[in-house]
Regions:
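Short glycine/threonine-rich turn/loop motifs
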Residues: 2-120, 188-274
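Proline-centered turn/helix-capping motifs that create local helix->coil transitions or kinks
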Residues: 182-188
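Periplasmic c-type cytochrome electron-transfer domains
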Residues: 68-156, 160-180
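Short secondary-structure boundary segments
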Residues: 29-35, 173-175, 182
Length: 274
């Protein structure tokens, strides 16, 4: 079979070939499922970002419990898929459509404060309402005493544990390597992806084709104005995002609203959130 010239057989052989991850990504894979990194020894990254649920939560709870089960997180847990192309935060992020003005965009966490996936991965570890590790030292100690300490040293140097900050940063880089290299984090396997890449199974129905036209129509729905689908924007392939932040809440209750019966002038009251 290895010498077969049948394209289908060759394609099957390629698909069956196991994915080879770099040493840092192998470390990241083990760390991703390591509950010992949490304060209670009961929670891993995968507890909230379950691979079986597209790296999202494995339950219907809107806000997940933390390692300290008396605590809950502050926001709904997002999927970790398709994060590898997200740029660092910028107050004036460029808009790919070339028309819309620049606006805040990029970064990780709800406010973009983590510039990279490596920086983002470190934040839940020390968050008291998430993994609740006591300190960087506690996390590094758990790695050093774990079953993959030797692999960690192979990936990041024999003396990596000599410096706590260096080892903690390396752990974030390992998880970033996993999320970048492991194709399950960005499979591009939906019907629309198959359609975009002209692959088997990617034939749209007439209704779906009409929906695509509507989605891209600037004069009607203009969904693509924010959900950009152009190829190779920051290295991504049609993620339907321009990575910017949008204000989708109710309009501000101020004097700019015509006939507002009870306006609250912006900035006049220190308790007013603008």
């Amino acid at each position: 079979a290895c010498n077969s010239t049948d394209p289908a057989a060759a394609q099957g052989a390629v698909a069956a070939r196991p994915q080879v991850l770099s040493l840092p990504a192998q470390v990241g894979q083990l760390a991703f499922f390591d509950k010992r990194l949490s304060g209670g020894g009961n929670m891993s990254c995968a507890s909230c970002h379950d691979p079986q649920y597209a790296y999202g939560p494995p339950n219907s709870i809107s806000v997940q419990l933390g390692s300290d089960i008396a605590q809950t997180g502050a926001r709904a847990v997002p999927s970790l898929r398709y994060r590898e192309s997200t740029p660092a935060y910028d107050d004036n992020a460029p808009n790919p459509d070339g028309v819309t003005s620049e606006s805040p965009g990029g970064g990780f966490m709800w406010d973009g404060r983590a510039a990279t996936m490596a920086a983002q991965a470190a934040l839940p570890l020390l968050n008291p309402v998430e993994m609740n590790a006591a300190s960087k030292e506690a996390v590094v100690k758990a790695v050093r005493e774990g079953g993959y300490a030797a692999l960690f040293q192979q990936a990041f140097g024999a003396r990596v544990f000599d410096d706590t900050d260096q080892a903690f940063d390396a752990l974030g880089k390992a998880i970033q390597a996993l999320e970048t290299e492991d194709l399950s984090f960005h499979p591009y396997s939906s019907k629309y992806d198959l359609y975009v890449f002209n692959k088997i199974g990617g034939v749209l129905t007439p209704a779906e084709r009409r929906g695509e036209v509507l989605f891209h129509s600037s004069g009607v729905a203009n969904c693509s104005g924010c959900h950009y689908t152009g190829a190779n924007f920051n290295g991504n392939t049609g993620l339907m995002s321009d990575f910017t932040y949008q204000a989708l809440a109710a309009p501000r209750n101020d004097r700019s609203i015509p006939h507002n019966p009870d306006p609250i002038p912006a900035h006049d009251d220190p308790t007013y959130f603008d």
